[in-house]
Amino acid sequence: MKETTSISFRGCIAISPFRYLWFGQICSQLAVNTTLFTLALILYRSTGSNTAVSILFLSYGIPSLLFGLLAGVIVDHLDKRRVLILCDIVRAVLVLGLFFVFQNPFLVYGLLFVHALLTQFYVPAEAPMIPRLIPQTMLVTANSLFSFTYYSSVGLGFILAGPFLRVFGAHVTFIIISTLFVVASFFVSLVPKQQSLQSFTSIMRKDFITLLQKVLRDVREGLAYVSSSKKLFDALLLLTGTQIILTILGTLGPGFADRVLEIDVRDASIYITAPVVIGIIVGALWVGSIGYQRSKERLIRTGIFSAGTILMIISIIIRFSRVVGMQWIFDSFLRLPLLFLLFFLLGVANSLLDVPSNSILQSQAQGTMRSRIYGMLTAAVGGIGILPVIAGGVLADAIGVGKVIFSLGFVITLFGLYRLKRYNT
């Protein structure tokens, strides 16, 4: 790999193996999120229930609890390029299956579960490839680029889901998504192979007990490795928390648009997801080009307090807009642009957390440990996030979306105060 001291996005993209991996990530993440949000819109429109949407997200998240650690350990010993290719191809086939069953919620939950199971192998295979393809001096910038792609694909997936359903209908939408997975597998196939690694079949041919013992041993080593480094544990905790919160907000999105903003569910992306994604893009670009020169701890601390405060302000605005005599101040003409701005700032705050935390995790986790740590991340999100995600949907149906959002902001702010006190101590 040609060494370069130019810490820039152009410098990262100029490295062809990284560029192919990045293109593959764009297509794959866009396909994943368009699938998820298309199903969320279909389900909410047919049921009108935040809880039903929460179950959909749980169907996608539970496999990370059950198989995240196992997948991370297995991927450690495989050619990660081949893992990515196979995952993309099989997920393309699964999306075509939705073509026939999307009107049956239980079958949708089942197919999405299998889809998410494959993603457990995809995630720990993709992120650890970055340090192998990029010089250490460009790692923060490369992670910034991947964060930009990841979160913009979340927003673009939500943005495309509504118009696709309106213009093409569900069947053609699923065909388009399946094609994106195939294109992603093509780009990843251009990334150089890893040498001296085992095949999946050679691993599975081993005695099952021996394999299980190895998995448990590797998991124990991974847990010990994380607990031995305060920086690594802190980064893992922050990434877990941000992903859980984003998942909760994602489950509340359709209900927020319908019951609070009182707009068409399919337009939720315009007033909710789009500003968040724009903010994430701006934040990631700033961190990657300028912000990386500042203290990672300062960036993270700013992100935590900003996110908590913004969520509470959003909830307060919603509350005031329903108070008799205050409606004229917070009518839709003023309320929608104001909420757009706040969701934009929420996206910026997320980037201040995500990019530095990912960089800390990758720089602290050495060698094959990276895959195990990312496997632990996906398992933690699926395991720890089960209760908050389902509770968020149930509480939103029971007490209202606004109160749930305020509670999230309050908890985040308390965590920021606790972390600040611990850091100063």
Model feature map: region roles:
Residues 19-36, 59-73, 79-92, 107-166, ...:
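Substrate-agnostic recognition of the 12-TM MFS/MFS-like secondary transporter fold
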Residues 37-50, 251-266:
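Short amphipathic helix-loop junctions that connect adjacent transmembrane helices
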Residues 15-16, 49, 104, 169, ...:
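Short loop-to-helix capping motifs
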Residues 106-109, 116, 141-205, 274, ...:
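Hydrophobic alpha-helical transmembrane segments
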Residues 47, 79, 101-103, 317-318:
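Helix-breaking motifs and short loop linkers at transmembrane-helix boundaries and internal kinks
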